[in-house]
Amino acid sequence: MSNPFNVVGINPCCVPSKSRADELAISQRMSVERRIVRAGSVDGMVKLDGGPFLMGTEDREGFPADGEGPVRETHVDPFYVDATPVTNAQFAEFVKATGFVTESERFGWSFVFQGHLDPERYKKLVEDTVLIVPWWCKVPGAKWDRPEGPDSSIASRMEMPVTQVSWNDAWAYAEWAGKRLPTEAEWEYAARGGLEQQTYPWGSELTPEGKH
């Protein structure tokens, strides 16, 4: 690897733009006593050989505004990536060690998928929705350890992937873990599962043989 950090497997949602200024701000906010764990370790990671692949899509399922097209040949160097997403337990360890405060905690709210809210909680908690995608609901108090709002909990979900994590939060976690976030090309290369120009890692059909 040309980069000294390994890639961490974290799945932020509603990803904001990033800048070096954001990165420096995060670094400054973190405790000077933070400890770097697993630095250089590849435990729980898989190595991908890299090489050329066709990146992007021109399929109608893609979003042109996200720059997903045109399809172009891209090359990635060999790299490691976490075999599984970062769990609530792992993120909790990071927060305990550093005192890190996520962006949703500082904002005081986050988006919650409508399907995760029963009708009663939807009526009680939701302040607003996104105009074009109304299934994303603005919920006050939603954060990584209260993912569906103040009355929710991750106590029974410690080994499930952490949610309500922004790009900046993920960047901070990766730095603490002695790793880094994947580039867009690395992420797409890994997510394609070795298949070329297929919609999903298993092919182009969402539910082959009725299974997803």
Locations of regions flagged by a protein language model:
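N-terminal pre-domain segments of enzymes
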Residues: 2-38
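Functional-site microenvironments in short loops/helix caps that host divalent-cation chemistry
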Residues: 18, 25, 42, 47-48, ...
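Acidic/histidine-rich helix-loop elements
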Residues: 57-67
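Well-ordered beta-strand positions in beta-sheet-rich domains
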Residues: 71-73, 78
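Acidic-aromatic/histidine active-site loop/patch
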Residues: 87
